[in-house]
Curated annotation (Swiss-Prot):
Null allele phenotype: Causes the formation of defective spore walls and a lack of trehalose biogenesis, leading to a rapid loss of spore viability and reduced tolerance to various stresses. Also leads to delayed germtube formation and reduced hyphal branching.
Range of residues in the leader sequence: none
Lineage of source species: Eukaryota, Fungi, Dikarya, Ascomycota, Pezizomycotina
Residue ranges of the region described as Disordered: 116-174, 232-316, 334-364, 381-400, 429-542
Gene: wetA
Name listed for the protein in its UniProt record: Developmental regulatory protein wetA
Biased composition (Polar residues): 165-174, 269-291, 347-364, 381-398, 449-462, 501-511
Highest taxon in the source lineage: Eukaryota
Keyword entries, A-Z: Activator, Conidiation, Sporulation, Transcription, Transcription regulation
Record bears the keyword Cell membrane: no
Basic residues bias: start-end ranges: 463-473
Length: 566
């Protein structure tokens, strides 16, 4: 992809782009390149319409009435168009710095000037068949093409903001839009068709000359350099004749006629694209790593005003993807070997997914079999299968802190769906074990301290968790334990008929109660009743004894009294 060797002959030309200041620009206002464009575009009308810029030829500042650009263009003589077709505006290797730096007049101070032939050659060559309102639009676009503007605004975010600001309708006067309506689009396309063919290979370069100085002094990483060139080529190497169709509803809705793009404009855009690709491939030779796949196929940002044109123009042709001519020839070789450079940048995802040691080999073998089976084509020999999992799957694994057994379960999700079913069935007992563990702990503590098993079971009945799990177990223990059963005559003190019977089970049918049961266990109410009856008998006995003693002391008949009391 970067097969061309780097040439150090551009360093002197690059130093001329870099080493210039505003004093040199201001001191060379009278520098102008003479050509045949002086006959096409008059200097006074251009200086009065393009903004607050002084004319390049030092004249006295006379106030002239602003005239629309279209009136100057349509009043051209026929020999001016013929001389424009024979124009040869070549870019020498030793161009004066002010002639190049003055092109960025929207980013410099207002008193700076711009040479008329350079600007008009850029505007007319890039828009041969567009409305006259578009040359304002294209002249502002050429300011962003200049090397100084790219050198000053290396941040991609600031460059997108400047590009968005330069295309806003507030910078264009509505009176000029009203006055600049195109009346004869066929005549415009016919006049400048020959000129665009002559000057297509001789325009100013879209970027500063490729130099290793820029790569050495660049502090941004390699991915930002690639995205820097992608955004610059996305906005600059596009077909310039397609611009009115993208902005016709918002900005240029006042122009009545939109002309179709001519074949010369498409040829011009392709030549510009190939020239820029050759320069950008040379300038990125000294970078540390090749551009990765997601940087090459970068999606357009929503803040970019040309995002619509990159996806809706000519079914994603060469103008939308700047690195397409290299990638179509070497698809697999350019896409997959760049992936291992992206893999070590995500060590946290890799270690979390592959953290369980016994399951690491299974996961890597399954992923090698899966991805070499036809889903993914080419891999490097040092490319590990466990690290090739997509970061979206890894972010699902690392999204929430989870225990070790759950982590073992989720680490097999990107491999096969059968692993997920087996491990989900495997992971259900530990979940139940963790829910049962708080209820099992009081039983282990209470067994040595509490003496009788009945009191232990009564204490565990109070726990809400144990009632559901151990209700059947407690009922079987209560029926199997031997209990003392009192006979029916247990209320009488002197009966002596207390027996201990072992009852194995209880059946509530009347016939079985006659055959099996010999007594009923005393309940709480029967115990209270027996105690009260015993107290009443003791009270009557004490009273009778006291009465007998009193009668005996008095000398009465004791036998007759005992017969009455007993």
């Amino acid at each position: 992809m970067f097969a061309q060797p780097f040439d150090h002959a551009f360093n002197d030309l690059f130093s001329q782009y870099v080493d210039m200041d505003s004093s040199m620009v201001d001191g060379n206002k009278d520098v102008s390149i003479p050509s045949d464009f002086d006959q096409i575009f008059s200097l006074d009308s251009l200086s009065s319409d393009c903004g607050d810029h002084s004319p390049p030829v030092p004249t006295k500042p006379t106030h002239q009435s602003p005239q629309p650009w279209a009136t100057d263009l349509w009043s051209l003589p026929q020999d001016a168009a013929s001389s424009a077709s024979q124009c040869s505006f070549t870019f020498q290797d030793t161009v004066h710095p002010s002639a190049v730096s003055d092109l960025s007049f929207h980013l410099e101070a207002p008193p700076t000037s711009h040479p008329v032939p350079a600007v008009t050659c850029k505007a007319s060559s890039r828009s041969p068949s567009t409305p006259p309102a578009t040359p304002h639009h294209k002249s502002t676009k050429s300011a962003l093409v200049t090397p100084k503007s790219i050198r000053r605004h290396r941040d991609s975010h600031e460059r997108k903001l400047l590009r968005k600001q330069s295309f806003s309708p507030s910078l264009m006067r509505p009176s000029q839009l009203q006055a600049g309506r195109m009346m004869y689009p066929e005549a415009w396309a016919q006049r400048f068709q020959n000129f665009s063919l002559h000057s297509s290979g001789e325009h100013l370069p879209l970027s500063p000359p490729p130099s290793d100085i820029l790569v050495q002094h660049e502090n941004t990483p390699a991915d930002n350099v690639v995205t820097h060139m992608n955004h610059s080529t996305e906005g600059l190497s596009r077909n310039p004749a397609e611009m009115p169709s993208h902005y016709e509803t918002g900005i240029f809705n006042q122009s009545p006629a939109i002309s179709m793009p001519s074949p010369s404009a498409k040829l011009l855009a392709q030549q510009q694209q190939h020239n820029y690709l050759s320069q950008s491939n040379n300038s990125t030779m000294a970078t540390s790593s090749p551009p990765s796949g997601d940087d090459i196929f970068s999606s357009p940002h929503s803040s970019d005003p040309q995002s619509l044109s990159s996806w809706h123009s000519d079914s994603l042709g060469g103008s939308a993807l700047p690195f397409t001519p290299e990638l179509q020839a070497h698809d697999g070789q350019a896409w997959w070997p760049s992936m291992p450079s992206r893999v070590p940048r995500q060590p946290s995802y890799q270690h979390v997914v592959s953290s369980p040691a016994p399951q690491r080999s299974i996961q890597s073998n399954n992923q090698h079999d899966l991805m070499q089976g036809g889903l993914m084509i080419q891999f490097d020999s040092s490319f590990d299968g466990s690290t090739s999992a997509d970061p979206s799957f890894s972010s699902v694994v690392t999204s929430a802190p989870m225990p070790q057994e759950n982590q073992n379960m989720y680490s097999h999700i990107p491999v096969t769906p059968q692993k997920y079913m087996n491990l989900s069935a495997y992971a259900t007992p530990p979940v139940q074990h963790t829910s049962r563990s708080p209820s099992l702990s009081p039983r282990g503590r209470g067994s040595p301290t509490q003496g009788s098993p009945l009191r232990n079971e009564a204490s565990t009945k109070t726990s809400p968790h144990r009632r559901g799990y151990h209700g059947r177990k407690l009922s079987s223990q209560s029926m199997n334990t031997p209990k003392p059963v009192k006979g029916p005559n247990s209320s009488s003190p002197g009966s002596g008929s207390n027996k201990s019977l072992t009852v194995s089970f209880v059946n509530f049918t009347p016939n079985d109660s006659k055959k099996i049961l010999t007594g009923v266990a005393p309940s709480g109410s029967s115990k209270t009743k027996a105690r009260r009856e015993q107290e009443a008998r003791d009270r009557r006995r004490k009273l009778s004894e006291a009465a007998i003693n009193a009668v005996r002391k008095a000398g009465g008949d004791v036998e007759a009294l005992e017969a009455v009391l007993c």
